């Protein structure tokens, strides 16, 4: 009998690849092993380190992920989560129906998943298989511990060498994280609806995201205003935009939660939060844009 923490990796040979030789990884007792005998143990918490020695940024410490988790679980990003679920659901819907019953599971990859908030939501709300990775071991420890269903394949992995087989993913989700479009195109496969290509759902900050904190710290920032145009242009160079959705909400917020936001947001990395009069901030705007697209075989025509 396969232990619960191992069961989610039973079909690893269909999706996971060795980071050293890129061949398929197969579950053998409590480890993932490739044909060349490279072996990666499954941690008791339920994740696998497919990276080696972690080189995470000091900005993304265990404490920063705990702060992020507190904010996410408080509901401030629920409107973003719901939009992501809708976008992934639309990618999934063409494959539903009697013809898909015995087909390969619809697989979603959460790239740069952090503490796993979105990956867990996708797995809990949609009938899909979820693989999620992050460069941070601390993040994966937290993600795996909060995965009560023991259903997501959690990996410590590198965006420049995603430990996933070519063409094994139907939908890549990238929420407020860096992108590697060449790797995304490599892992994406046509969906189960004939020749329909795989889908990328990339979530980026909107122009009004955290505008209250931006105004408070404007004297210390390179730019008083934010635009995601460069990110959007790069997206469209590699993926054909099929949808673009903006979601925004402004929340009244306690001084404690404002301080947690200030500590966790990359906007204020390198700025001494103690130098800011955070008590002036009574509300914070959470605005995101979802860029949804399919891979371009070449540059835009």
Predicted regions and their residues:
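Conserved class I S-adenosyl-L-methionine
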Residues: 199-232
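N-terminal auxiliary segments of SAM/dcSAM-dependent transferases
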Residues: 1-58
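A short acidic, Gly/Pro-enriched loop at the edge of an enzyme's catalytic core
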Residues: 160-171
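A short SAM/SAH-binding and catalytic strip from SAM-dependent methyltransferases
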Residues: 169-183, 204
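Conserved Class I S-adenosyl-L-methionine
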Residues: 13-14, 246-301
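A short glycine-rich, Lys/Arg-flanked "PGG" loop and its adjoining helix->strand segment in the class I
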Residues: 181-199
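Class I SAM-dependent methyltransferase Rossmann-like catalytic core
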Residues: 57-80
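Class I SAM-dependent methyltransferase SAM/SAH-binding core
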Residues: 107-161
């Amino acid at each position: 009998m396969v232990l619960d923490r191992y069961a989610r990796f039973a079909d690893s040979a269909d999706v996971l690849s060795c980071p050293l030789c890129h061949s398929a990884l197969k579950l053998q007792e409590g480890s993932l092993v490739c044909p060349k005998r490279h072996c990666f143990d499954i941690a008791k918490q339920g994740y696998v380190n497919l990276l080696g020695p972690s080189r995470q940024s000091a900005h993304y410490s265990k404490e920063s992920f705990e702060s992020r988790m507190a904010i996410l679980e408080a509901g401030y990003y629920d409107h973003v989560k719901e939009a992501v679920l809708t976008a992934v659901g639309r990618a999934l819907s063409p494959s539903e129906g009697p013809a898909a019953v015995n087909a390969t599971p619809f697989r979603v990859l959460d790239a740069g998943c952090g503490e796993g908030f979105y990956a867990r939501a996708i797995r809990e709300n949609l009938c899909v298989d979820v693989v999620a990775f992050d460069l941070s071991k601390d993040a994966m420890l937290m993600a795996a511990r909060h995965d009560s269903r023991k259903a997501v394949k959690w990996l410590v992995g590198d965006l420049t060498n995603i430990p996933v087989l070519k063409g094994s993913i139907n939908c890549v989700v990238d929420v407020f994280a860096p992108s590697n479009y060449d790797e995304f195109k490599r892992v994406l496969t046509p969906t189960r609806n004939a020749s329909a290509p795989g889908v990328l759902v990339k979530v980026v900050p909107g122009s009004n995201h955290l505008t209250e904190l931006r105004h408070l710290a404007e004297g210390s920032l390179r730019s008083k205003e934010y635009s995601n145009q460069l990110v959007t242009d790069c997206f469209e160079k590699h993926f054909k935009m099929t949808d673009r959705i903006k979601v925004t909400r402004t929340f009244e917020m306690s001084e404690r939660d404002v301080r947690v936001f200030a500590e966790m947001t990359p906007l204020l990395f390198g700025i001494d939060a103690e130098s800011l009069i955070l008590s002036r901030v009574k509300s914070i705007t959470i605005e995101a844009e979802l860029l949804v697209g399919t891979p371009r075989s070449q540059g835009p025509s």
